[in-house]
Amino acid sequence: MDTLIAQLQRRFCDFTISLYHQGFLDDQFTELKKLQDECSPDFVAEVVTLFFEDCEKLISNMARALDQTGNVDFKLVGSSVHQLKGSSSSVGAKRVKGLCVTLKECCDSQNYEGCVRCLQQVDIEYKTLKAKLQDLFNLEQQIVQAGGRIPQVDI
């Protein structure tokens, strides 16, 4: 059993490090992890789940607004992307946050094609991050269920 725990912990550390090295996460995610303790072991997963729900709503709102060809409310899209950038920043979603900056610039210049293209990239990046973080949280659960502790990962 100890070998299984050690293998899971190693996979967890390697996977976590890869998320930082590939630019999916930044130091804010590390800060968020520091707020998690024995009293609130699911804190990060809960915060990230709320982030995912926010992302889906905001991306959907922006897609609907951009669907109004010839009558796009760029202020609405800009407001939604600003919220998404803030949410992304608060959980350490580095790539999503970076794309939000570009999308905001497209909104500010009322570049319709740029907005559509950037929003598609945001959606892809969000879905990729969601899958990766769900894998990370699943690894955490496997470690705990095997009787192990989640290792501290130094980036």
From Swiss-Prot:
The record's InterPro entries line, in alphabetical order, gives: AHP1-5/YPD1 (IPR045871), HPT_dom_sf (IPR036641), Sig_transdc_His_kin_Hpt_dom (IPR008207)
Q: What is known of its domains?
A: Histidine-containing phosphotransfer domain (HPt) contains an active histidine that mediates the phosphotransfer.
What keywords appear on the UniProt entry? Acetylation, Cytokinin signaling pathway, Cytoplasm, Nucleus, Phosphoprotein, Stress response, Two-component regulatory system
Q: What does this protein do?
A: Functions as a two-component phosphorelay mediators between cytokinin sensor histidine kinases and response regulator (B-type ARRs). Plays an important role in propagating cytokinin signal transduction through the multistep His-to-Asp phosphorelay.
Q: How does it assemble?
A: Interacts with the B-type response regulators ARR1, ARR2 and ARR9. Binds to ETR1, AHK2, AHK3, AHK4, AHK5 and CKI1.
In its UniProt entry, what is this protein called?
A: Histidine-containing phosphotransfer protein 3
Domain HPt, by residue range, is: 40-147
Task: Please give the CDD domains that the UniProt record associates with this protein.
Answer: HPT (cd00088)
Gene Ontology CC = cytoplasm; cytosol; nucleus; plastid
Q: Where is this protein localized, as stated in its record?
A: Cytoplasm, Cytosol; Nucleus
Q: Which GO terms describe its biological process?
A: antipodal cell differentiation; cytokinin-activated signaling pathway; embryo sac egg cell differentiation; phosphorelay signal transduction system
Its post-translational modification remark reads:
Two-component system major event consists of a His-to-Asp phosphorelay between a sensor histidine kinase (HK) and a response regulator (RR). In plants, the His-to-Asp phosphorelay involves an additional intermediate named Histidine-containing phosphotransfer protein (HPt). This multistep phosphorelay consists of a His-Asp-His-Asp sequential transfer of a phosphate group between first a His and an Asp of the HK protein, followed by the transfer to a conserved His of the HPt protein and finally the transfer to an Asp in the receiver domain of the RR protein.
Q: Does the keyword Acetylation apply?
A: yes
- What induces this protein's gene, according to its Swiss-Prot or TrEMBL record? By salt, cold and drought stress.
Q: Which Pfam families match?
A: Hpt
Q: Which residues carry this modification: N-acetylmethionine?
A: M1
- Tissue expression from the record: Strongly expressed in roots. Detected also in flowers, leaves, siliques and stems.
Q: Identify the domain of life.
A: Eukaryota
Could you tell me which residues carry Phosphohistidine? Answer: H82
GO MF annotation: an example: protein histidine kinase binding
